[in-house]
Amino acid sequence: MNILLSNDDGIMSPGIITLKTYLQQKHDVYVVAPDIERSATGHGITVRNPLWAKKVKFGDTFFGHAVNGTPADCVKIGLDAIYKDIHFDVVISGINRGANLGTDVLYSGTVSAALEGAVGGYPSIAVSCVDFSNPNFEDGAKVVLNILEKLDLNNWPEFTTLNVNIPKIPYDEMKGIKITKQSRRRYQDYFEERKDPFGNSYYWMLGNIIEDDNDDNSDYNVINQGYVAVTPLSVFMTKYDFIDELKSWLEV
């Protein structure tokens, strides 16, 4: 199959290099990724500045196109310009260094790149290794290959992305795959005021993870049980169970 591959850690990050290495054993892989790390850029796109897409080699071999934009930019320009004549079967983003659980998906460039694929009408998958300090991207790539072999891409629901999180254990110790829902995992942020060498104030964001009550089927709990967590996400965010009550407040 034809795969468009992107990420938010940058085109020369170990996660995307490893994933391409594994995927291209069975598939045709086309890489369009940010020229530098663009983590936590969300779903921003570039509208008032030019985008450059430069060909990049890994060793002596062409690897992909590096774009001076966001992860969502990369998917857009990959689908609609650089490889507009290619019929892609799936868009994959990753492998990310660190988890994308709960509200992480709102900020994640990794997830946003995959969601941009969904906006364009393509099946899409975001992949993250929960282990930030020492992620095993080879194990992550094995998980992706396993998932791809099982998916029915011809019966994919519209505007849908799979958010895949891989636990911090060796591949052979993973218990399997579980379909999950987003956890109520968020952050309590605070800003530490500091001084630069010239005495000017600047702020550094820090924070603590808040784990609200989560059932056993949340992405966070499933990961901690030793399973790969696969959460289907939709491009559309309407809160349907609030519509009727909101009408009673405002449509009067």
Curated annotation (Swiss-Prot):
GO terms for molecular function: 3'-nucleotidase activity; 5'-nucleotidase activity; exopolyphosphatase activity; metal ion binding; nucleotide binding. GO terms for cellular component: cytoplasm. InterPro entries: SurE, SurE-like_Pase/nucleotidase, SurE-like_sf. Binds 1 divalent metal cation per subunit. Its cofactor is a divalent metal cation. Pfam families: SurE. Nucleotidase that shows phosphatase activity on nucleoside 5'-monophosphates. Belongs to the SurE nucleotidase family. This is 5'-nucleotidase SurE. It comes from Petrotoga mobilis (strain DSM 10674 / SJ95). The gene is surE.
